[in-house]
């Protein structure tokens, strides 16, 4: 399940059968997609007796919770894009550079290896991620490496 846009006011929400690579349902959109749009597609599948084995979707806020009765996986492509947004295309820290390399292996490795790489990265950089800096404006301590931290926890 995913939506694609052309400009700001026209898009299409698609549901594709991952096994047969066949379009099952679509809805044209004149604004951003909503959870209700996705649920409309799921309901159409159910009405037409499709067996839903799992759902791969983007990170629309609240969508996994709305689809909690199904196995839901966050799209690997979107996950890598999220990491890139936090780290930028040219990370400034060694930790960020290493994390980005690991993220880009997501689609090319198995679960056990990927988790192992993340665990090793965290073992090396975990304490560094916890560093805090005093914000002179608020007087509160904030995480020093917020973007790398956000990328890791995303």
Regions found by a protein language model. Give the residues of each.
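Repeat-unit-sized solenoid/scaffold elements
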Residues: 37-39, 43, 89-96, 139, ...
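Generic preference for hydrophobic/aromatic residues in regular secondary structure cores
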Residues: 15-16, 23, 72-74, 99, ...
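RNase H-like nuclease fold core
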Residues: 1-61, 65-70, 147-149
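Short, charged/polar low-complexity linear motifs in solvent-exposed/disordered segments
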Residues: 18, 25-26, 41-43, 82, ...
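Conserved beta-strand -> loop -> alpha-helix junction used to position metal-binding or nucleic-acid-contacting
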Residues: 54-103
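Acidic/histidine-rich catalytic cores and adjacent linkers
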Residues: 50-53, 57-61, 103-154
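Short, amphipathic alpha-helical segments
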Residues: 32-39, 57, 74-77, 93, ...
